[in-house]
Swiss-Prot record:
Keywords in alphabetical order: Cytoplasm, Guanine-nucleotide releasing factor, Phosphoprotein, SH3 domain
Gene Ontology terms: cellular component: cytoplasm
Modification Phosphoserine, positions: 6, 41, 111, 212, 231, 234
Primary gene name: Arhgef16
Origin: domain of life: Eukaryota
Modification Phosphothreonine occurs at: 230
Span list, region Required for RHOG activation and mediates interaction with EPHA2: 279-485
Protein name, per record: Rho guanine nucleotide exchange factor 16
Native species: Mus musculus
One Gene Ontology MF term: PDZ domain binding
Start-end of Basic and acidic residues biased regions: 212-227
The keyword Cell membrane appears for this protein: no
Assembly notes: Interacts with ELMO2, EPHA2, RAC1 and RHOG; mediates activation of RAC1 by EPHA2. Interacts with TAX1BP3 (via PDZ domain).
Position of sequence motif PDZ-binding motif: 711-713
Length: 713
């Protein structure tokens, strides 16, 4: 114990020696002659107080055994230093740090004395060991912080720095302190903060694009446009500079996927905007309009960057091309080069307007022109989606060489650890997000009639394009599906039904258990089954013969079909017993006018509550079309957290950040209406989070109604 105490005392003495040399003090504690404008002596003590000058010679370094007696404590307000007058003050160099952008670069110089002092402060106060390491040189003296941790560390470091003088060391280690503090110049090599403070100008960057949004290109899959949010109709706008770290949002706004990163720069953070001084005179609404314009530009750049990765890493890969046929390669990548060319032209037009004006007058004319005359490759690409998804699934399931090569490509740093499918669906994502971004621009121009009219026309043009993309995708899928089923259905002795029709499409298909009186008490595995094909206008009941052949038993127009869920207490058949555990989820289908003009009743059972709910919902398609939804504002809403691809006809494909009105919930599945286009379908509950903010819910409904009216979707 004594040895430890002795070592501690020796460390303190050595520390005093080094610090004495740092301040260039003589034996009496006075500054060395030659320092200008120093009026009186200064001798720091271990307790941060001061005593009058002494003339005794400098003592030799004390040994651990030779301890000085404790000195009296003098209050700082009564010390001679506090009573002395002067125009200059000597402070440790380690505290003379001007405001600068903080950096984690290890290249910053830290004096030996400052490093020892910080360690000494931590040794004297064990509580500091739990705090994160820090450098005195990296402390921003002008930064305002409300955290107790950083403020306490600053106070601790100052007390440690003013600990007191000791015997000086060699001259080579001394540091000359001038009477005037010089501000440190900002380092050009420091990377800019992603979200600098509003009043802090981060100018003078020597980067590839001089602080441009091109400095740090992000994959489109990783960003979330702020204009997609629907709770920004008030002055509390999400286009304001983010106040939190990347990936976080304010409370009580729409839920945002944590993996998303907002765009790295906002318009008001651009160096040219800061240098122009326009922010001092610009109104809040105009600044928000500029942010909306700039976000369309930056998000298009990220989208174009991701498309270039798809082309260079996947499309142009010789190894990947060698694993498939030319037809499969075409179905997989379609006309992606044409889509990329259209995006390149669109971005160049936006960038040219951005470079010409610090405050962009308008981009509505660019949006409308490209939507009408240059974005037609999107329609062809979206129409090919059904072949693309089928080809990718086939290659992934049956082609080992394709799987191996694809896995190696996806591991490359350029792909960001993302699968190829996330790149293939980018055109569909971008074209469906453009109306929402343009709608945000409309909201920001409501105070300017001419700009609002131009933005509304651009919104109509883009919405018309999206509608054509959706119709193209549905038409190709439905046409191929109808022709395939027409060859697979065998009507046999049943009156033939002309199946092929341009206005007919499949709503749902699947196998169900058929309940008979003789089979009520049988096990599920031994019960007979039937296979249903439900179209938007007719129900076809078949018996499955093979994977590609079905024998038609009966059919009826959907207007003549009724469905009813059977409760546990109800008998399955007239005069029969109540529901058995072997028949878990039964329901009844009545054909009021079948293929022979007679009434027929069918008792069916599914293997899950969600499957039964989905069949009942599909069979009541006609009724729901007529009834509609009266008050959508009362419906719960969810935001999709990860993309979901429909696997059955009654399911809906969703993208990240899609808003969905929940119409029904059953056994882990949700049936909802997609906000952006009104399409309905089922999807797993685990792919979305509930929106709990009432303000966000009401904003979503208002935006949906406005989009439906202005775009006639």
């Amino acid at each position: 114990m004594s040895q430890r105490h002795s070592d501690s005392s020796l460390d303190e003495k050595l520390l005093e020696y080094r610090f004495h040399a740092e301040l260039r003090l003589d034996a009496n504690g006075n500054p060395i002659p030659g320092l200008p404008m120093v009026r009186s002596s200064l001798k720091a003590r271990a307790n941060a107080a001061f005593e009058p000058d002494a003339s005794e010679p400098l003592p030799p370094p004390p040994s651990p055994e030779d301890e000085e007696p404790p000195r009296p404590i003098v209050l700082s307000t009564q010390s001679p230093a506090a009573l002395k007058m002067g125009t200059q003050q000597l402070i440790p160099k380690s505290l003379a740090v001007a405001s600068k952008a903080k950096t984690k670069s290890p290249a910053r110089h830290q004096s030996f004395g400052a490093a020892v002092l910080s360690k000494e402060a931590a040794r004297r106060n064990p509580q500091l060991f739990s705090a994160p390491s820090f450098s005195l040189d990296d402390m921003d003296m002008d930064m305002v912080t409300t955290g107790n941790l950083r403020r306490n560390l600053r106070n601790q470091s100052y007390r440690a720095a003013m600990k007191g003088p000791g015997p000086p060391s060699s001259k080579g280690d001394s540091v000359q302190l001038g009477p005037k503090l010089q501000a440190l110049a900002e380092e050009a090599a420091q990377p800019p903060s992603r979200y600098p403070a509003k009043n802090k100008k981060t100018l003078g960057r020597k980067r590839a694009h001089k602080g441009s949004f091109k400095d740090d290109p992000q994959l489109y899959q990783e960003i979330r446009e702020r204009g997609l949010n629907t709770s920004h109709e008030s002055d509390d706008d999400i286009l304001d500079e983010p106040s939190g770290p990347v990936g976080t949002q304010r409370a009580d706004t729409t839920i945002v996927v944590k993996s998303y990163r907002p765009a790295q720069l906002t318009w008001s953070q651009l160096p040219e905007v800061l240098e122009s001084g326009v922010l001092d005179t610009l109104s809040t609404e105009e600044r928000k309009r500029q942010e909306a314009i700039f976000e369309i530009l930056t998000s298009e750049f990220s989208y174009l960057h991701s498309l270039s990765i798809l082309v260079t890493e996947f499309l142009q890969s010789r190894e990947l091309r060698a694993t498939m046929t030319q037809t499969e390669h075409h179905h997989l990548f379609s006309n992606i080069l044409d889509v990329m060319s259209a995006s390149q032209k669109f971005f160049e037009a936006l960038e040219q307007r951005h470079k010409a004006q610090v405050c962009v007058e308008d981009i509505s004319d660019i949006l409308e022109d490209h939507a009408q005359h240059h974005f037609h490759p999107y329609i062809a690409y979206c129409s090919n989606e059904v072949y693309q998804q089928r080809t990718l699934q086939k290659l992934s399931n049956s082609n080992a060489a394709f799987r191996d090569v694809l896995k190696e490509i996806e591991k490359r740093p350029a792909c960001g650890g993302l699968p190829m499918i996330s790149f293939l669906i980018l055109p569909m994502q971008r074209v469906t997000r453009l109306p929402l971004l343009t709608d945000t621009l409309c909201l920001k121009t409501q105070g300017h009639p001419e700009r609002y009219k131009a933005a509304s026309q651009a919104l109509k043009a883009i919405s018309k394009l999206v509608k054509q993309c959706n119709e193209g995708a549905h038409k190709m899928e439905r046409t191929e599906q109808i022709y395939t089923l027409n060859m697979q259905l065998d009507f046999g002795k049943v009156k033939s039904l002309p199946l092929i029709s341009a206005s007919r499409w499949l709503l749902k298909r699947g196998e169900l258990f058929l309940l008979e009186e003789s089979s009520i008490f049988r096990k599920i595995a031994s019960r007979p089954t039937c296979y249903l094909f439900l179209f938007n206008d007719v129900l076809v009941v078949t018996k499955k013969k093979s994977e590609e052949s079905y024998l038609v038993q009966d059919y009826a127009q959907l207007d003549h079909v009724q469905v009813r869920k059977l409760e546990p207490s109800e008998p399955l058949l007239p005069g029969g017993s109540s529901r058995s555990s072997s028949v878990p989820y039964p329901f009844q289908v009545n054909l009021l006018h079948n293929s022979e003009g007679r009434q027929e009743q069918i008792l069916l059972s599914s293997d899950s509550a969600s499957d039964r709910a989905r069949w009942i919902t599909a069979l009541t398609y006609k009724e729901r079309q007529w009834q509609g939804i009266t008050n959508k504002g009362e419906l719960p809403q969810v935001e999709v957290t990860k993309a979901y691809f429909a696997k059955q006809a009654d399911e809906i494909t969703l993208q990240q950040a899609d808003i969905v009105l929940v119409l029904q919930e059953e056994d882990g599945w949700l049936h909802g209406e997609r906000l952006r286009d009104g399409e309905t379908g089922w999807f797993p509950e685990s792919f979305a989070h509930s929106i709990t903010s009432r303000v966000a819910v009401e904003g979503n409904v208002r935006r949906m109604e406005r989009l439906r009216v202005e775009t006639d979707v």
